[in-house]
């Protein structure tokens, strides 16, 4: 490939960055190896970048009359507004960054692209895989034509990413 590499947004933990709630990463060497020479990765961790720190308590998605909320599992504290403030700013940045695609971390309350487990208020019962991570949902709303996958789509999705 000559010239500039295409820009691909990616959940930072998939590149081995230790930004997850437990202080670890979820490195996906296959993604890196397949794409490293063809793309410029733009790593993003909504929870860390929104100031929630590392490590941080686990969170989950809850259904509420106000929509899907991101809740700290141990305390019930609602982190949705903090994340949404960051997401609003980040989506504007993504518009200027000209990314061609995004690779999300599956099942994450912020980055889950496919249905993420959704709970009733107070995590009393699972409503099943019905939700979508807040950041992933915002990206889909704002960039409906963009190719978006999660790490479970590899290696098949790599062919689409490097057309």
Give the location of each predicted region.
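Glycine- and acidic-residue-enriched helix-capping/strand-helix junction motifs
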Residues: 20-26, 120-130
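Short, surface-exposed acidic-centric catalytic microdomains
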Residues: 32, 39-67
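N-terminal phosphate-binding or glycine-rich loops at protein starts, especially the Walker A/P-loop
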Residues: 2-39
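Divalent-metal-activated hydrolytic enzyme cores
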Residues: 66-89, 93, 97, 124-163
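Short amphipathic alpha-helices and their capping/turn segments at secondary-structure boundaries
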Residues: 1-3, 30-40, 86-100
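N-terminal glycine-rich phosphate/adenylate-binding segment common to multiple enzyme folds
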Residues: 86-121
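Short beta-strand segments
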Residues: 11-12, 45, 103-107
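Short catalytic/ligand-binding loop motif for oxyanion handling, primarily in non-cytosolic enzymes
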Residues: 18, 53, 110-114, 157-159
């Amino acid at each position: 490939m000559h010239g500039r590499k295409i820009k691909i947004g990616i959940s930072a933990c998939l590149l081995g960055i230790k930004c997850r709630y437990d202080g670890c990463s979820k490195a996906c060497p296959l993604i890196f190896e397949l794409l490293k020479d063809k793309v410029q990765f733009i790593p993003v961790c909504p929870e860390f970048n929104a100031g929630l720190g590392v490590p941080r308590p686990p969170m989950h998605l809850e259904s509420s009359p106000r929509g899907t909320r991101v809740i700290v599992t141990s305390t019930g504290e609602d982190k949705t507004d903090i994340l949404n403030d960051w997401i609003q700013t980040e989506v504007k940045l993504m518009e200027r960054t000209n990314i061609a695609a995004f690779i999300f971390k599956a099942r994450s309350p912020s980055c889950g692209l496919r249905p993420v487990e959704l709970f009733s208020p107070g995590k009393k019962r699972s409503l099943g895989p019905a939700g979508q991570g807040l950041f992933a949902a915002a990206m889909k709303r704002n960039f409906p034509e963009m190719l978006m996958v999660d790490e479970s789509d590899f290696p098949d999705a790599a062919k689409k990413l490097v057309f």
